[in-house]
Amino acid sequence: MVNLSIIISSSEVNGPGGLFDINATLPLVAIQFLLLMVLLNVILYSPLLTIIEERKEYILNKLAKASEILSQANELTAQYEQELNTVRKEAQLEITNSQKIHKEILEIELNISQKYIDNLLENITDDLLEKKNTALNSLDTIVQSLCVQIENRLSI
């Protein structure tokens, strides 16, 4: 490479003719630049641009699908939350109804037990009063018979 540059710098243009005589260097470099630009555009940039465009479309499609899936997930979440709230309300109503029913059953059983105890107590009280009256009557007859016997003995 160094040798080539030395040769070019040491060479002299002798005489007329050649490219450098008409000063066409600048247009030639411009034509070379344009040809190289067209060649690079056809060979390198066009395939790169198509690949980039395909990748852009692929990403946009994936983003659209992802946003669609996200919106569906949000809809399902809202639907399930609403269903969960209604089920919770129904369960709460069921619990309160069951508590009311159990409370009523307990009150009924308590009333039945209270009536049974009241009846039993009344029966026992009546029975005791009857036994007391019977005992007092029998004691009264015994006392009267003893009084009669005492009088009989005293009168003798």
Curated annotation (Swiss-Prot):
Subcellular location: Plastid, Chloroplast thylakoid membrane
Membrane topology: Single-pass membrane protein
A Pfam cross-reference name: ATP-synt_B
Main subcellular location: plastid
Keyword Cell division attached: no
Regions crossing the membrane: 24-44
Record keywords: ATP synthesis, ATP-binding, CF(0), Chloroplast, Hydrogen ion transport, Ion transport, Membrane, Nucleotide-binding, Plastid, Thylakoid, Transmembrane, Transmembrane helix, Transport
InterPro entries registered for this protein in UniProt: ATP_synth_b, ATP_synth_b/b'su_bac/chlpt, ATP_synthase_B_chain
Xref: CDD domains: ATP-synt_Fo_b (cd06503)
Any one GO cellular component localisation term in the record: chloroplast thylakoid membrane
GO molecular function, a single term: proton-transporting ATP synthase activity, rotational mechanism
General remark: In plastids the F-type ATPase is also known as CF(1)CF(0).
Role played: F(1)F(0) ATP synthase produces ATP from ADP in the presence of a proton or sodium gradient. F-type ATPases consist of two structural domains, F(1) containing the extramembraneous catalytic core and F(0) containing the membrane proton channel, linked together by a central stalk and a peripheral stalk. During catalysis, ATP synthesis in the catalytic domain of F(1) is coupled via a rotary mechanism of the central stalk subunits to proton translocation. Component of the F(0) channel, it forms part of the peripheral stalk, linking F(1) to F(0). The b'-subunit is a diverged and duplicated form of b found in plants and photosynthetic bacteria.
Quaternary structure note: F-type ATPases have 2 components, F(1) - the catalytic core - and F(0) - the membrane proton channel. F(1) has five subunits: alpha(3), beta(3), gamma(1), delta(1), epsilon(1). F(0) has four main subunits: a(1), b(1), b'(1) and c(10-14). The alpha and beta chains form an alternating ring which encloses part of the gamma chain. F(1) is attached to F(0) by a central stalk formed by the gamma and epsilon chains, while a peripheral stalk is formed by the delta, b and b' chains.
Family: Belongs to the ATPase B chain family.
Protein name: ATP synthase subunit b', chloroplastic
Lineage: Eukaryota, Sar, Stramenopiles, Ochrophyta, Bacillariophyta
Name of the encoding gene: atpF2
